[in-house]
């Protein structure tokens, strides 16, 4: 299963959001210009993280298969394991959907069990976060694992991370690399050379690449035709 053609055109690697956790707290530089927190503050909403059990039925109510992005961070320390398990159970009970669980705190999900329709991913904005988070992701059972290199704030050398060596006799443990610049009026720059280097690394490992958005001509672009020709890449794992 993959995102719909309409979402493909927009660069979205999901069809529908599932906000099972409201709010979040800063954990690393990627959080500094968080649009969700800015909107919450603008409208006077609380940014304190809390689990939303009233939304557990959302995937059950949709019968048509869809790719769900699980927002916000299921690995947040404010959640206890019972709450995390309830979210995973709701996903397991709706196998017609694919769930993409993205966390900046992958160590908290290491006790999760592998479920065929759940992919686990972690955000990697720079080398320190790659070194810190990817090993935890690799230690977590998952049908597939992915990296969200967005916002990409610095060059990242994946080969420096233990477990990401390219070995002829062992499948590469990452199934997808999503790459993108930061958005918003206070966005920090993403050098296209960093993006190209990551694409080369992914190619060497046989990993599909999904380039979500890039800053071109001073604007954040989402359409492939606005990207440099060699970066018009949106691939999906088989």
Where are these regions (language model features)?
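Auxiliary Fe-S-binding modules of radical SAM enzymes
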Residues: 1-22, 43, 153, 159-238
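Active-site beta-loop-alpha junctions enriched in small/polar residues
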Residues: 73, 104-106, 123-127, 150-154, ...
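A structural motif corresponding to the C-terminal end of an alpha-helix
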Residues: 90-97, 140-143, 198-208
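Conserved Radical SAM active-site core
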Residues: 1-118, 127-131, 156-171
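Acidic, His- and aromatic-enriched active-site or binding-groove loops in soluble protein domains
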Residues: 121-125, 234-237
